[in-house]
Design a protein with these regions (language model features):
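Extracellular beta-rich ligand/substrate-recognition surface
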Residues: 6-14
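Glycine-rich beta-strand-centered segment in the early N-terminal region that forms part
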Residues: 22-37, 51-100, 113-114, 133
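Glycine-rich Rossmann-fold phosphate-binding loop(s) that bind the pyrophosphate
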Residues: 77, 148, 183-187
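Short Gly/aromatic-enriched secondary-structure transition segments
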Residues: 44-52
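Residues that mark the start of a beta-strand
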Residues: 4, 28-30, 177-179
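Adenosine-nucleotide cofactor-binding segment
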Residues: 176, 182, 193-236
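Hydrophobic/small residue at the entry helix of a nucleotide-binding pocket
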Residues: 187-188, 215
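NAD(P)H dinucleotide-binding glycine-rich loop of Rossmann-like/cofactor-binding domains
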Residues: 97-176
Protein backbone atom coordinates (compact mmCIF):
# COMPACT_ATOMS: atom_id res chain seq x y z
CA UNK A 1 0.00 0.00 0.00
CA UNK A 2 1.20 3.51 -0.78
CA UNK A 3 1.28 6.23 1.84
CA UNK A 4 1.99 9.93 1.70
CA UNK A 5 3.95 11.31 4.64
CA UNK A 6 6.23 14.07 5.88
CA UNK A 7 9.61 12.57 6.75
CA UNK A 8 12.63 14.22 8.33
CA UNK A 9 16.08 13.63 6.81
CA UNK A 10 18.10 16.09 8.90
CA UNK A 11 18.09 19.59 10.34
CA UNK A 12 15.20 21.50 8.74
CA UNK A 13 15.06 18.86 6.00
CA UNK A 14 11.39 17.84 5.88
CA UNK A 15 10.02 16.18 2.76
CA UNK A 16 6.46 15.34 1.75
CA UNK A 17 6.81 12.03 -0.06
CA UNK A 18 4.73 9.19 -1.43
CA UNK A 19 6.18 5.71 -0.97
CA UNK A 20 5.22 2.07 -0.51
CA UNK A 21 4.70 0.57 2.92
CA UNK A 22 6.27 -2.88 3.36
CA UNK A 23 4.11 -6.02 3.67
CA UNK A 24 2.37 -6.24 7.04
CA UNK A 25 3.96 -8.61 9.57
CA UNK A 26 1.98 -10.86 11.91
CA UNK A 27 2.77 -8.63 14.89
CA UNK A 28 1.92 -5.30 13.21
CA UNK A 29 -1.19 -3.23 12.48
CA UNK A 30 -2.02 -1.20 9.37
CA UNK A 31 -3.91 2.02 10.09
CA UNK A 32 -5.23 5.20 8.50
CA UNK A 33 -4.43 8.51 10.18
CA UNK A 34 -7.37 10.91 10.37
CA UNK A 35 -6.04 13.70 12.57
CA UNK A 36 -2.66 14.86 13.86
CA UNK A 37 -2.10 17.94 16.00
CA UNK A 38 1.16 19.87 15.80
CA UNK A 39 3.49 19.97 18.81
CA UNK A 40 6.44 22.27 19.46
CA UNK A 41 8.42 19.10 20.11
CA UNK A 42 8.23 18.42 16.37
CA UNK A 43 9.73 21.87 15.77
CA UNK A 44 12.52 20.95 18.18
CA UNK A 45 13.06 17.73 16.21
CA UNK A 46 13.36 19.71 12.97
CA UNK A 47 15.86 22.10 14.56
CA UNK A 48 18.03 19.35 16.07
CA UNK A 49 17.88 16.56 13.50
CA UNK A 50 20.26 13.73 14.41
CA UNK A 51 21.08 15.43 17.74
CA UNK A 52 17.56 14.82 19.06
CA UNK A 53 17.58 12.10 21.73
CA UNK A 54 14.62 10.21 20.24
CA UNK A 55 16.15 9.94 16.76
CA UNK A 56 17.72 6.78 15.38
CA UNK A 57 20.57 8.51 13.59
CA UNK A 58 21.54 9.03 10.88
CA UNK A 59 18.26 10.42 9.55
CA UNK A 60 19.76 10.80 6.09
CA UNK A 61 19.73 7.00 5.81
CA UNK A 62 16.83 6.37 8.22
CA UNK A 63 14.22 9.09 7.65
CA UNK A 64 11.40 9.15 10.19
CA UNK A 65 7.76 10.15 9.77
CA UNK A 66 7.07 13.14 12.02
CA UNK A 67 4.00 13.82 14.17
CA UNK A 68 3.16 12.09 17.44
CA UNK A 69 -0.30 13.42 18.40
CA UNK A 70 -2.54 11.39 16.13
CA UNK A 71 -5.75 9.45 15.96
CA UNK A 72 -7.24 7.26 13.25
CA UNK A 73 -8.80 4.01 12.13
CA UNK A 74 -7.40 0.49 12.03
CA UNK A 75 -7.39 -1.08 8.55
CA UNK A 76 -5.75 -4.49 9.00
CA UNK A 77 -4.52 -6.44 12.03
CA UNK A 78 -1.71 -8.99 12.16
CA UNK A 79 -2.58 -12.37 13.66
CA UNK A 80 -0.76 -11.70 16.95
CA UNK A 81 -3.12 -8.86 17.85
CA UNK A 82 -6.33 -10.07 16.17
CA UNK A 83 -7.88 -10.96 19.53
CA UNK A 84 -7.56 -7.37 20.79
CA UNK A 85 -7.88 -5.08 17.76
CA UNK A 86 -10.22 -5.23 14.76
CA UNK A 87 -10.43 -3.51 11.36
CA UNK A 88 -12.65 -0.44 11.60
CA UNK A 89 -11.71 0.20 15.22
CA UNK A 90 -10.72 3.79 15.97
CA UNK A 91 -7.50 4.32 17.87
CA UNK A 92 -5.44 6.85 19.78
CA UNK A 93 -1.82 6.41 20.78
CA UNK A 94 0.61 7.15 23.61
CA UNK A 95 3.90 7.87 21.78
CA UNK A 96 6.18 7.71 24.84
CA UNK A 97 6.69 3.95 24.66
CA UNK A 98 9.62 3.54 27.06
CA UNK A 99 10.38 0.35 25.16
CA UNK A 100 13.25 -1.60 26.75
CA UNK A 101 14.68 1.57 28.23
CA UNK A 102 14.88 3.42 24.89
CA UNK A 103 13.49 6.83 23.97
CA UNK A 104 12.10 5.58 20.65
CA UNK A 105 8.72 7.04 19.84
CA UNK A 106 6.34 7.32 16.88
CA UNK A 107 6.91 10.68 15.23
CA UNK A 108 10.65 10.63 15.94
CA UNK A 109 12.16 7.21 15.50
CA UNK A 110 10.26 5.10 12.97
CA UNK A 111 10.12 4.96 9.17
CA UNK A 112 6.51 3.80 8.90
CA UNK A 113 4.61 5.33 11.83
CA UNK A 114 3.95 8.97 12.58
CA UNK A 115 1.03 11.36 12.58
CA UNK A 116 1.89 13.28 9.42
CA UNK A 117 0.97 10.41 7.12
CA UNK A 118 -2.06 8.99 5.37
CA UNK A 119 -1.40 5.32 6.19
CA UNK A 120 0.99 3.85 8.75
CA UNK A 121 2.25 0.54 10.08
CA UNK A 122 2.05 0.34 13.86
CA UNK A 123 5.00 -1.78 15.07
CA UNK A 124 4.77 -4.54 17.63
CA UNK A 125 6.36 -2.58 20.47
CA UNK A 126 3.48 -0.07 20.53
CA UNK A 127 1.06 -2.86 21.41
CA UNK A 128 3.56 -4.64 23.64
CA UNK A 129 3.81 -1.52 25.78
CA UNK A 130 0.01 -1.15 25.82
CA UNK A 131 0.27 2.23 24.08
CA UNK A 132 -2.43 1.67 21.44
CA UNK A 133 -5.92 2.46 22.70
CA UNK A 134 -9.37 1.97 21.28
CA UNK A 135 -10.94 5.41 20.78
CA UNK A 136 -14.72 5.47 21.12
CA UNK A 137 -15.56 9.18 20.82
CA UNK A 138 -16.84 10.86 17.66
CA UNK A 139 -14.30 13.62 16.99
CA UNK A 140 -10.88 12.35 15.90
CA UNK A 141 -9.17 15.61 16.84
CA UNK A 142 -10.02 15.00 20.48
CA UNK A 143 -8.11 11.73 20.27
CA UNK A 144 -5.11 13.63 18.91
CA UNK A 145 -5.30 16.04 21.83
CA UNK A 146 -5.20 13.23 24.39
CA UNK A 147 -1.37 13.24 24.29
CA UNK A 148 -0.84 16.95 25.02
CA UNK A 149 -3.64 16.91 27.60
CA UNK A 150 -1.92 13.99 29.32
CA UNK A 151 1.21 16.16 29.55
CA UNK A 152 -0.80 18.90 31.27
CA UNK A 153 -2.45 16.49 33.70
CA UNK A 154 0.88 14.78 34.38
CA UNK A 155 2.52 18.10 35.20
CA UNK A 156 -0.11 18.84 37.84
CA UNK A 157 0.23 15.37 39.34
CA UNK A 158 4.02 15.76 39.47
CA UNK A 159 3.85 18.82 41.75
CA UNK A 160 4.46 18.19 45.43
CA UNK A 161 4.47 19.83 48.85
CA UNK A 162 6.42 18.96 51.99
CA UNK A 163 5.81 19.67 55.65
CA UNK A 164 8.49 21.15 57.94
CA UNK A 165 10.69 18.39 59.29
CA UNK A 166 9.43 15.81 56.81
CA UNK A 167 10.72 14.64 53.46
CA UNK A 168 7.43 13.00 52.51
CA UNK A 169 6.16 14.34 49.19
CA UNK A 170 2.46 15.22 49.14
CA UNK A 171 1.76 14.91 45.43
CA UNK A 172 -0.41 17.23 43.37
CA UNK A 173 -1.50 20.83 43.79
CA UNK A 174 -3.00 21.97 47.09
CA UNK A 175 -6.79 22.32 47.43
CA UNK A 176 -7.64 25.90 48.31
CA UNK A 177 -4.06 27.03 47.69
CA UNK A 178 -2.52 29.60 45.38
CA UNK A 179 -1.30 28.51 41.96
CA UNK A 180 1.08 30.43 39.67
CA UNK A 181 1.18 29.58 35.96
CA UNK A 182 4.18 31.29 34.33
CA UNK A 183 4.24 32.08 30.60
CA UNK A 184 0.98 30.16 30.35
CA UNK A 185 -1.15 31.69 27.61
CA UNK A 186 0.03 29.62 24.66
CA UNK A 187 -1.84 26.46 23.61
CA UNK A 188 -0.50 24.31 26.46
CA UNK A 189 -0.79 27.17 28.93
CA UNK A 190 -4.44 27.71 28.09
CA UNK A 191 -4.99 24.00 28.63
CA UNK A 192 -3.25 24.29 32.00
CA UNK A 193 -5.53 27.17 33.02
CA UNK A 194 -8.62 25.25 31.94
CA UNK A 195 -7.54 22.14 33.85
CA UNK A 196 -6.79 24.19 36.97
CA UNK A 197 -10.31 25.64 36.85
CA UNK A 198 -12.23 22.50 35.92
CA UNK A 199 -10.01 19.72 37.28
CA UNK A 200 -10.68 17.71 40.40
CA UNK A 201 -8.49 19.80 42.73
CA UNK A 202 -9.33 23.50 42.82
CA UNK A 203 -7.04 26.27 43.96
CA UNK A 204 -8.49 29.35 45.65
CA UNK A 205 -6.39 31.64 43.47
CA UNK A 206 -4.73 31.23 40.06
CA UNK A 207 -2.20 33.81 38.85
CA UNK A 208 -1.30 33.68 35.15
CA UNK A 209 1.70 35.54 33.70
CA UNK A 210 3.24 36.15 30.29
CA UNK A 211 5.62 38.70 28.73
CA UNK A 212 3.21 39.45 25.86
CA UNK A 213 0.21 41.61 26.76
CA UNK A 214 -1.59 40.76 23.52
CA UNK A 215 -1.43 37.06 24.41
CA UNK A 216 -2.70 37.82 27.91
CA UNK A 217 -5.59 39.82 26.49
CA UNK A 218 -6.51 36.97 24.18
CA UNK A 219 -6.37 34.49 27.04
CA UNK A 220 -8.76 36.66 29.07
CA UNK A 221 -11.26 36.52 26.22
CA UNK A 222 -10.99 32.73 25.96
CA UNK A 223 -11.05 32.04 29.72
CA UNK A 224 -12.75 34.86 31.58
CA UNK A 225 -12.37 35.89 35.20
CA UNK A 226 -16.13 35.42 35.55
CA UNK A 227 -16.00 31.79 34.38
CA UNK A 228 -13.41 31.04 37.06
CA UNK A 229 -15.47 32.83 39.70
CA UNK A 230 -18.36 30.47 38.97
CA UNK A 231 -16.03 27.65 40.05
CA UNK A 232 -15.08 29.49 43.23
CA UNK A 233 -11.65 30.52 41.93
CA UNK A 234 -10.03 33.94 41.79
CA UNK A 235 -8.30 34.20 38.40
CA UNK A 236 -5.68 36.92 38.06
Amino acid sequence: MKTKAVRIYGVNDLRLEEFDLPPLKDDEILARVVSDSICMSSHKLAMQGDAHKRVRAPLAQNPAIIGHEFCGEIIEVGSKWANKFKPGMRFAIQPALNYKGTLWAPGYSYPYIGGDATYIIIPNEVMEMDCLFEYKADAFFMGSLSEPVSCIVGAYHAQYHTQPGSYVHEMGIKPGGSLALLASVGPMGLGAIDYAIHGGIKSARIVVTDIDQARLDRAQKLISVESAQKEGIELI
